[in-house]
Amino acid sequence: MAQLPGILRSLAWDHTGPPAVVDRLDDAMPAITTVPMATPVLALLEGSPHTGPWTLRWTSAGHPPPLLLTQDGQERYLEAGQGLLLGTPPGTGGGSRPNATEPLPPGSTLLLCTDGLIEVPGSDLDTGLARLRRHALALAHEPLDTLCDQLPARMPPGSTDDVALLALRLPSP
């Protein structure tokens, strides 16, 4: 599994859109790894670094959706980029990978996490996503380092999977 991030970076060198890069990774996996399935999300933030406007372009292959927290207290999962896991057998359905775009408002926070943060044995995925949303919203106005420390601590123990959390906060106007 550790090979896939490096392979993904090397396939993205030409700034091709996220869906095409993830498709290339899916095509390459059987030939260059022993990983049968994986769930990446590949996202690209576009816009002027300090002034915006910003747009997120992404695709997901079975990964939990990004969570957007706006400065005015709104929150929602960005589900338009959801697609099939890497390694899903051909003909399973789904067609081409989604190429999702979403404008990101100034001052908003974007959270991406692995399923280890939301999946707990005996609890379904929707419950885990709702729990993450609730705790993230309560921490939305905290500094990012506090949010990243406190959010996993507020999730129930018992996950048997890896936990990773990436948080991005855009400058306020």
Question: What is each of the regions a protein language model found here?
Answer:
Residues 2-173:
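Conserved subregion of the PPM/PP2C metallophosphatase catalytic domain
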